[in-house]
Amino acid sequence: MKTKAGFVALIGKPNAGKSTLLNTLLNAHLALVSHKANATRKLMKCIVPFKDKEGYESQIIFLDTPGLHHQEKLLNQCMLSQALKAMGDAELCVFLASVHDDLKGYEEFLSLCQKPHILALSKIDTATHKQVLQKLQEYQQYDSQFLALVPLSAKKSQNLNALLECISKHLNPSAWLFEKDLMSDEKMRDIYKEIIRESLFDFLSDEIPYESDVMIDKFIEEERIDKVYARIIVEKESQKKIVIGKNGVNIKRIGTSARLKMQEVGEKKVFLNLQVIAQKSWSKEEKSLQKLGYTHQRNRD
C-alpha cells in the first residue's frame, strides 16, 4: 500500500469555519463549533484519512488553530502563539477565508507564514454565484503566493474532496504517523472540556463565554461510564449568578447539553458535576492560564 502522511496547519480569521470543516471531514463532533467568533482557544490535532487519485492512502493531520487576531489580553496572546506554532510545525498550511471576508486577513497571513499553502474559500453556500466568482477574482492577484484556490462549503459538503486531493498531492510519501482509526490524539478529558465550553457559547450571551473557561478537576474513566467533575471559571460574581441562573436553570441547561454531547462522542454514559466559581482577572494572569493549559511563547530578540 502506498502511503503519505503530514501535518497541515488550518489557519484563518475568527469564525472562518475551521472547526465546522474539521468536524465535517471527520464525520464526528470533536472541534468546538459556535456561531460566535473566536471560540477555539487551543491547538487540536484532527486526523483525516484520504485515498487520492494516484492511489496513495494519505493520513492528513490537521492542526486546528485559534483564529488569527491581535489583542493585548494575555489569553489572546496565548491563542495567537498557538496559531504561529502550528504554522511553524506544519509542512503545509491551509488558509480558510470566508467568502464574506475582505482580503486583509489573508494579507496578514502572508506576512506571518513562510510555508507553502492552499487558499480555501469557505461558506460559498451562503453567497450568490456572482459573489463567489467576484471573491475568487479578488484573490487571483495573489496567485503566485498559493498552491491552489479551492472554494468550498463544509455545511453542504461541497468541494471537500477537492481540498483533500490538493493537500494529498503536496504531501511526501511516508508511513502513517498514527493508528488507522484514530481521529485525534486528544485525551478524552480535554475533548470533554471543549464540549462544556461549547455549551457555554450555546447558552450564554455577550461577553461571558469569552471571560470564562473550564477546569476538569477530576476525571474517572470506567468501562460503562465516565465521571467528570468540572469547574466553570468566570471573572465576576455577577457573571457567576448569570451562569447559574434563577433556581439553577442555566447551569442545568449547560450541563444537560454538554453531557448528551459527551455521551455521543464517548459512546458511553457520562456523569457530569459542574460547579461555578468567580476568579478575578484569570485571563490576564500567567499562572492561572498555565493551570488551564495555556502557554505563551514570547518573542526572542
From Swiss-Prot:
It is a peripheral membrane protein. One of its GO terms (cellular component) is cytosol. One of its GO terms (molecular function) is GTP binding. GO terms for biological process: ribosomal small subunit assembly. It comes from the Bacteria. Residues 152-154 are annotated as: G5. InterPro entries: G_ERA_dom (IPR030388), GTP-bd (IPR006073), GTPase_Era-like (IPR005662), KH_dom-like_a/b (IPR015946), KH_dom_type_2 (IPR004044), KH_sf_prok-type (IPR009019), P-loop_NTPase (IPR027417), Small_GTP-bd (IPR005225). The keyword Cell inner membrane applies. Keywords: Cell inner membrane, Cell membrane, Cytoplasm, GTP-binding, Membrane, Nucleotide-binding, Ribosome biogenesis, RNA-binding, rRNA-binding. GTP binds at residues 12-19, 64-68, 122-125. Residues 4-173 form the Era-type G domain. It is found in: Cytoplasm; Cell inner membrane. Residues 122-125 are annotated as: G4. Pfam families: KH_2 (PF07650), MMR_HSR1 (PF01926). Residues 12-19 are annotated as: G1. Transmembrane segments: none annotated. Residues 38-42 are annotated as: G2. NCBIfam families: era, PRK00089.1, small_GTP. PANTHER family: GTPASE ERA, GTPASE ERA, MITOCHONDRIAL. Belongs to the TRAFAC class TrmE-Era-EngA-EngB-Septin-like GTPase superfamily. Era GTPase family. An essential GTPase that binds both GDP and GTP, with rapid nucleotide exchange. Plays a role in 16S rRNA processing and 30S ribosomal subunit biogenesis and possibly also in cell cycle regulation and energy metabolism. This is GTPase Era. It comes from Helicobacter pylori (strain P12).
